[in-house]
Amino acid sequence: MLKRISAIAIITLLSASLAACSNSTNSSSTNSSSSSQTASQTASKSSVTASNTSADSSSVFTDRDLTQTADTSSAKKLTLSDGKDTTITEAGVYVISGTAKDASIIVDAADDAKVQIVLENVSITNSDSPCIYVKNADKVFVTTAADSENTLTVSGSFTADGDTKTDAVIFSKDDIVLNGEGKLNISSTDNGISGKDDIKITGGTININCTADAIEANDSISVADGNITINTQKDGLHAENDDDNTQGSIYISGGTFNITAGSDGIQGTTTVVIDGGTFTISSAEGIEATNITINDGNITISASDDGINAASKSTAESVCITINGGNLKITMGQGDTDGIDSNGDLYITGGTIDITGQSACDYDGKAEKTGGTLIVNGQETDTIPNQMMGGHGGMGGRGDMNGDMGDMGGFPR
């Protein structure tokens, strides 16, 4: 029930943000180490200080999500050891420290358990298993202690846990929140952080270097704050549910993002909504989803393909890009690339959009500019140019089903 309430809150927020575009349609596990350390504790009530947030984002983030410190007065203190897993089976706050090899922090608690892990200068290096593995809980908080630096590394190929493909340094089957006042460094031969439900980030400094998706979730990714640096061969933020294309949303209300990605900087299946934050994205495609809404933020995109791309990936949303505010600077590479590419509608009601490239905009449906400033190759234009007339970008690539590509026009007229 708690997870359903959280999902409803996110859906309500996204529905409000997407008003300009109407919808198109209304375990068992194996412990890999030779020995195990088990920690149990009765639930302790954390002191919570409410953070300033907008009325909309408050429906997504709870007070505890946004609180960057934990009440450790009744916390269980644990020290890591080589070759030993630390298994948490009950709700509560756990302060973990130490350096270890081939050791995992495992959460396997009751369905209603809320577990808070406080990392205090932790260093874990594993060859084939997650450093933090959430098997079962209601929600898990991973909090970096103030002034701490924590490093989690997986150096080899991940080994499955039974039927579960554990392919990330932090791997969670349930809801997970990352926050705190310290630093978290993640290095992975696959994904960085993977959540099979919802992932929330509300604070801390997070550095991810990986070969696959840096942060991926089945249902949603929500970010309120934090300093996030990503270097990946695939996507920076990726939300997709292989079994349900009505899931896979991304909501960002703040934070600083420096993303270098081989594929997409930010990719959602259903929606991407940006209400704030500072973004520097260098990637093939900058921001991609079925339905994209930008209300505020400072966004700089350098893309070898499209800067912002809306293409049909979900039956739950209409294909649309809406820009209501913010400062956007988009630079594209040479070739069949577009600054803003919508396989549906495009609306600009506010903000400043500065596009440098061969084609500024490409849209298949309706385009309306009722406000804001649009600059194309140094010249301000009151109309939205269109370089349609050909193949259109899809999720993860360009061109139609026959491989035909669009023409190369699209300067303001």
What are these regions (language model features)?
Residues 2-413:
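A composition-driven surface/loop motif
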